[in-house]
Amino acid sequence: MKWKEFIINETKQSYLKNIIKKINNIENHQVVFPLKKQRFRCFDFFDIEQTKVVILGQDPYHTPKIANGLCFSVDLGNNLPGSLINIFKALEYDLQIKRTNPDLSDWAKQGVLLLNTVLTVNAHQPNSHKNFGYEELIKNVFNELRKQKHVVYLLWGKQAMSYINLIDQKQNLILCASHPSPLSAHRGFLTCKHFSKCNDYLIKHLRTPIKW
């Protein structure tokens, strides 16, 4: 099954219908990011069984024209947010790759699910949709992923790590580190070497490594 089919099915469930209705009401008087057409974009790229890596973010960027539906990613032409700068620093430290393109859709096209734990946010109000009920969607995503094996989970920060018990730890690889935010990246994220560890695991299990 494609991830796109999965999310279409989820939008028919009452919990997600309620979330969407709540957001539609908010949009009568408030700007919400990302744009409506991009809110489920992370599910657009591949089949569920093609999932190689899951990167779990928090909520989308709340400044205008930044969030694009993929966690940590921004479109070309935008300034790099602090978290993405630190992700690229960690990548260079690990694999000596000097990445400058802030659009991570090339990762998504290789089977990297770039999923936020909360999929929407009010403009200039971080965590404003934190209690909207997205937890059920994330749990359903992880339930689908339990049918797969040899997937690498990159859990950055406490919010991402709170989902660790939903992962089959015997059949997959879980890599945890502090969040790449400028407030916490110095607590181990910058030197975690998750990118090489991820690819080593994929190669070991006869899966194509990610071109970071």
From Swiss-Prot:
Stretches that traverse the bilayer: none
A Pfam family it matches: UDG
Catalytic activity: Hydrolyzes single-stranded DNA or mismatched double-stranded DNA and polynucleotides, releasing free uracil
SUPFAM superfamilies (UniProt xref): Uracil-DNA glycosylase-like
GO cellular component entries: cytoplasm
Any Gene Ontology biological process: base-excision repair, AP site formation via deaminated base removal
Subcellular location per the Swiss-Prot or TrEMBL entry: Cytoplasm
GO molecular function: uracil DNA N-glycosylase activity
InterPro entries xref list: UDG_fam1, Ura-DNA_Glyclase_AS, Uracil-DNA_glycosylase-like, Uracil-DNA_glycosylase-like_sf
Keywords per UniProt: Cytoplasm, DNA damage, DNA repair, Hydrolase
EC numbers for this chain: 3.2.2.27
Active site: residue positions: 59 (proton acceptor)
Sequence similarity: Belongs to the uracil-DNA glycosylase (UDG) superfamily. UNG family.
The protein's role, per its UniProt record: Excises uracil residues from the DNA which can arise as a result of misincorporation of dUMP residues by DNA polymerase or due to deamination of cytosine.
Name used for this protein in its record: Uracil-DNA glycosylase
Species per Swiss-Prot/TrEMBL record: Ureaplasma parvum serovar 3 (strain ATCC 700970)
